[in-house]
């Protein structure tokens, strides 16, 4: 505004529109600024008080460092919320980032950006399930793993290892997932079963099965794995984090997979769920969990302020 006023004083013969055109400023923006200036709401007139964050305590720093060394695949945000969920340290993600940077523990790979075209987001649990099969090699042969993922909560409703990928084996696995809904209210046509149109999902037997269980069959676009991107991403997570070696036998691999499923659902913070766990959204109260976490963060900040004030008072006392 001061620059415009000065230009009007130096060039009284030029009208306001010409001056604003030289500055590349729309006329509507100028009048909006003028109204805000009259009410003292321009940015250069607003005094924003500076606040200094209370630094973490040594105990909190040790907890973050040990957590980063123990969980090498967790990024700083997921690590921050995992420590909160375990009631070990209540630090903002940027504070965890600064600690990891200070101790040179930020060497985590950046994800490869990949545009995904997905169906409209689900707005309640069991509205839409994504399913797919992946192949695993161990015990000198190939096995198929089928997983069924709830789109709303990212909850792994069911997963198991199959000896064959025939339609009847897939139907039995889906039926086991549907059995978990016994006793719960289901809307007509739900859940919608989203798949990639593989040979297991296109035959007459599969269509009859979908009609019998009251679910809706949803086939994604051919040659477009991004349409089933939620489940494709889970497969990548399985490959990265589920420790099934080539020497494992079927019983051991099945036990490892079930244990990882419990960890994934109940303890692993999910970036798409504001770093809550899938179980919090699937059958829990995410609003209450977020409020509880925020309250713990505020309490931890107050405790840190008290800690450093005591350290300051003790240092002053030792000098006197």
Residue ranges, per PLM feature:
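RNase H-like DDE/DDD metal-dependent nuclease/strand-transfer catalytic core used by mobile genetic elements
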Residues: 89-93, 98-109, 116-145, 151-263
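Alpha-helix C-capping/helix-to-loop hinge sites
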Residues: 7-10, 67, 86, 241-245
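Structured, charged N-terminal subsegments at the starts of enzyme catalytic cores
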Residues: 19-36
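C-terminal domain-tail junction helix/linker
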Residues: 50, 211-213, 237-320
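Basic, flexible linker segments flanking DNA-binding modules
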Residues: 31-128, 225, 282-288
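Short, amphipathic alpha-helical "recognition" segments used to contact nucleic acids or chromatin
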Residues: 1-14, 61-70
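Short alpha-helical "recognition helix" segments of helix-turn-helix
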Residues: 15-22, 79
């Amino acid at each position: 505004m001061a620059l415009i006023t000065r230009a009007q004083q130096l060039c009284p013969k030029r009208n306001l529109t010409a001056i604003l055109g030289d500055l590349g400023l729309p006329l509507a923006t100028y009048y909006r600024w003028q109204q805000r200036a009259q009410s003292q709401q321009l940015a250069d007139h607003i005094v924003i008080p500076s606040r200094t964050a209370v630094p973490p305590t040594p105990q909190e720093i040790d907890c973050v460092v040990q957590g980063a060394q123990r969980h090498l695949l967790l990024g700083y945000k997921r690590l921050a919320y995992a420590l909160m969920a375990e009631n070990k340290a209540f630090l903002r993600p940027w504070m965890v980032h600064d600690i990891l940077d200070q101790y040179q523990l930020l060497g985590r790979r950046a994800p490869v950006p990949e545009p995904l075209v997905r169906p409209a987001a689900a707005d309640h649990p069991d509205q839409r399930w994504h399913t797919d099969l992946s192949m695993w090699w161990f015990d000198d042969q190939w096995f198929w793993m089928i997983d069924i993922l709830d789109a709303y909560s990212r909850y792994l409703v069911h997963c198991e290892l199959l000896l064959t990928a025939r339609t009847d084996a897939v139907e039995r696995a889906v039926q086991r997932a549907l059995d978990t809904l016994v006793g719960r209210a289901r809307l007509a046509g739900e859940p919608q079963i989203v798949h990639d149109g593989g040979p297991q999902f296109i035959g007459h037997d599969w269509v009859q099965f979908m009609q019998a269980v009251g679910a809706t069959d949803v086939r994604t676009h051919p040659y477009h794995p991004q349409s089933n991107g939620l489940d494709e991403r889970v497969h990548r997570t399985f490959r990265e984090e589920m420790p099934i070696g080539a020497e494992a036998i079927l019983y051991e691999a099945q036990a490892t997979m079930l244990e990882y499923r419990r960890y994934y659902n109940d303890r692993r913070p999910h970036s798409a769920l504001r770093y809550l766990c899938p179980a919090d959204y699937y059958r829990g109260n995410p609003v209450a969990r977020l409020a509880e976490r925020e309250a713990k963060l505020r309490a931890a900040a107050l405790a840190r302020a008290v800690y450093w004030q005591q350290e300051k008072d003790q240092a002053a006392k030792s000098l006197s």
